[in-house]
Regions:
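N-terminal glycine-/serine-/threonine-rich beta1-alpha1-beta2 phosphate-ribose binding loop
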Residues: 12, 24-155, 165-172, 178-179, ...
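N-terminal secretory signal peptides
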Residues: 1-2
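An acidic- and aromatic-residue-enriched active-site/binding cleft used to recognize and process polar
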Residues: 34, 121, 162, 187-190, ...
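Contiguous beta-strand/loop segments that form the cofactor/metal-binding neighborhood of enzyme cores
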Residues: 211-214, 224-353, 360-380, 389-392, ...
Length: 423
């Protein structure tokens, strides 16, 4: 059957020798097979962002890269009238199955794929009392693992965004992958997208304080902002130690904390805040202004409901995440290091629709894991950020009180080498 995938594979193999060339340094005797398990496959959903990178390829360092793994099956939990999966299946020659198990077994009686792409984002699911959308990532993961157990074989699993809205389930997912011995990767595109400037947190840096300024809603964009923070913080001296306490603030409480004296534990560093705004490419301006630093009065006028998450790490390091809708529409980071007088600061660059190339940066890392059997960075990062979101939303719902988080004592070491895109 001649379809788009077969044409691309043949053309790519002729042009680049993909049939015999090593992929990420590992020679392949045959092309690997990928199952997509997703909640929704509609325009601008995460399946559209990410799964389709394995159908049509993606730009990689100035070339169009065709992954050496084929989507051979899919399970789509919710399929409204604008579901794209039937059309994509016809175009690229894969099958959409009615259950997760059938997708992993490709309609047979044994697992018949080499990797699983789990995307539990978008779709119509209920909210809990803390404002968390109850995406069935844990339930879908459990169905995947059930096939692994029954068939006596595992594969790498990539999980998009949070592991779960419930920390106990998120931890169980990570523990299960470790117990069964399969590689697992998860999280946001923010840690692996381009940065402006292209800087990395020095490995084993002594961080005194850090700040992320971002935008968007809680339970969605706060996760991306926390992943932005965590990919830098985990490189500090001693490695990641986990989070001891979190306090979420909103409205006037945020402005009061921002007015606290410099160096006070009641707020955060104005110098870091200025560094973040100075890196932003979307800083709001008054009518007829070109590019001016906003006054406190302007910020209060433009940002109707600021949100702050104040984070205390087990080792005593402090960090803050700010959602400042109306002031910025990007993600910036700044940190005070013992080794330098000026803050280390950067913007995490997100290319716009329709190409949203930052998702290709994430899928390149997923592809590396699928091909090599080794996760490029620790899944524990996303275990921690998943728990941070839950704790912060519980703090917001509980009167903005500081919450001790003994469950979030997630310690781990990340690799020295960077994984974000530079060119």
């Amino acid at each position: 059957m001649l379809n788009r995938r077969n044409f691309l594979a043949a053309a790519g193999g002729l042009a680049l020798g993909l049939g015999t060339a090593p992929v990420f340094g590992f020679p392949q005797s045959r092309r690997k097979r990928l199952a997509v398990v997703t909640t929704s496959w509609r325009y601008r959903t995460h399946a559209w962002h990410m799964a389709e990178r394995f159908l049509a390829g993606y730009p990689l360092r100035g070339k169009w890269h065709k992954p050496a793994i084929d989507v051979v099956s899919a399970y789509v939990d919710q399929r409204p009238d604008d579901d794209l999966s039937p059309g994509r299946a016809k175009e690229f020659g894969f099958t959409v199955y009615p259950t997760v198990a059938e997708a992993l077994r490709c309609g047979g009686d044994k697992i018949d794929v080499d990797a699983v792409l789990l995307i539990g984002e978008h779709g119509n699911y209920p909210l809990n009392e803390f404002g968390q959308k109850q995406y069935p990532r844990y339930q879908l993961f459990s169905q995947i693992v059930d096939v692994f157990r029954k068939d006596g074989r595992t594969t790498p699993v990539f999980n998009d965004k949070h592991l779960s809205w419930k920390f106990e389930w998120a931890k169980e997912m990570v523990d299960t992958s470790k117990e069964m011995g399969f590689p697992m990767l998860a999280g946001s595109s923010l840690p692996v997208t381009w940065r402006m400037p292209s800087v990395e947190m020095p490995y084993e840096a002594e961080i005194e304080e850090a700040l992320v300024v971002a935008y968007g809603s809680t339970d969605i964009y706060d996760f991306h902002a926390l992943e932005t923070l965590q990919c830098m913080m985990e490189r500090r001296a001693g490695g990641e130690t986990g989070v001891r306490a979190i306090q979420a603030l909103k409205g006037e409480a945020v402005w009061a904390a921002m007015d606290a004296p410099e160096g006070s534990k009641a707020g955060w560093s104005r110098r870091l805040f200025e560094a973040c705004l100075s890196r932003s490419q979307t800083l709001a301006q008054g009518e007829s202004f070109s590019h001016r630093y906003p006054t406190p009065e302007e910020m209060r006028e433009w940002v109707k409901e600021p949100i702050a998450y104040r984070i205390e790490y087990v080792d005593g390091t402090r960090a803050t995440m700010l959602l400042m809708n109306g002031l910025v529409t990007d993600f910036t980071f700044a940190a005070k290091l013992k080794s330098q007088t000026e803050p280390l600061s950067t913007m995490f660059y997100l290319p716009p629709n329709p190409n949203v190339t930052y998702s290709a940066a994430l899928m390149e890392n997923a592809e590396k894991m699928f091909m090599t059997g080794k996760a490029p960075y620790p899944v524990q990062r996303t275990l921690l950020t998943s728990g941070m979101v839950e704790a912060a939303l519980q703090s917001l719902a509980g009167g903005q009180q500081r919450r001790l988080t003994p469950r979030l004592g997630v310690s781990y070491q990340t690799a020295r080498e960077s994984t974000f895109w530079r060119r």
